[in-house]
From Swiss-Prot:
This is Acyl-protein thioesterase 1. Present with 1480 molecules/cell in log phase SD medium. It catalyses: S-hexadecanoyl-L-cysteinyl-[protein] + H2O = L-cysteinyl-[protein] + hexadecanoate + H(+). It holds the Pfam family Abhydrolase_2.
Length: 227
């Protein structure tokens, strides 16, 4: 899986943050997160690798077949975001698992790995809480949702039920309405037995991020990697 990689400022690296972009974006679009965290708290993130993978180029059905970076095809713009390519979703999950394994093979402990994402990437990040074969340090979902609950229930392995999750969502999001974020939280808590799911609403925030959310994200990651 190609993309942007930012090596730890001080080697050897002890932690890794993997962050997955949204539809139509690339890993470089979230590369600012590495600099933000390193400047905000140099001591906490000086031994941290940052990995921003690129999604494959897909013809997105709901966008008239336009070719763009996408973790999975969206078959139709429906209010529930349920009409997606489930096989593509699972394929991307497998790719993320391989990325995690690459970090583990380099000597990073699973508990020192964070998986995060925005929008489509957040949907995948949340799904890793069900499917990953290792217990990781934490999961970050910005403007996330759940598209294939039935399939994910079949794959749940219980390994990350105690892994902390931070889900930030704007109450003015026109792309992934806040109701879908709430449904995702309910699904992962009720059907997947996730025990530590923090859902925070940001007033006035649309389908984007804001400084307050980034501050909360940074605090969550620091706490998760130091616990």
């Amino acid at each position: 899986m190609n993309g942007l990689r930012v090596a730890a400022k001080i080697q050897p690296a002890r932690q890794t943050i993997i962050f997955l972009h949204g539809l139509g974006d690339t890993g470089s679009g979230w590369g600012f997160l590495a600099q933000y965290l390193q400047q905000r708290d140099p001591a906490a993130f000086q031994h941290t690798n940052f990995v921003f993978p690129n999604a494959p180029e897909l013809h997105v059905t709901a966008n008239g077949g336009a070719l763009m970076p996408a973790w999975f095809d969206i078959l139709e713009w429906d209010p529930s975001f349920s009409k997606v390519d489930s096989d593509g979703f699972m394929n991307s999950l497998n790719s993320i698992e391989k990325t995690v394994k690459q970090e583990i093979d380099k000597g990073i402990k699973p508990e020192q790995i964070i998986i995060g994402g925005f929008s489509q990437g957040a949907a995948l990040a949340l799904a890793t809480s069900v499917t990953l074969p290792w217990k990781i340090g934490g999961i970050v979902a910005l403007s996330g949702f759940c598209s294939i609950p039935g399939i994910l229930k079949q794959h749940k392995n219980g390994i990350n039920v105690k892994t902390p999750i931070f889900h930030g969502h704007g109450d003015m999001d026109p792309v992934v309405p806040i109701g879908l974020g709430i449904k995702a939280k309910q699904f992962y808590q009720d059907s997947c037995e996730i025990q530590n799911y923090e859902f925070k609403v940001y007033k006035g925030m649309a389908h984007s991020t804001v400084p307050d959310e980034l501050e909360d994200l940074a605090s969550f990651i620091k706490k998760s990697l130091s616990s």
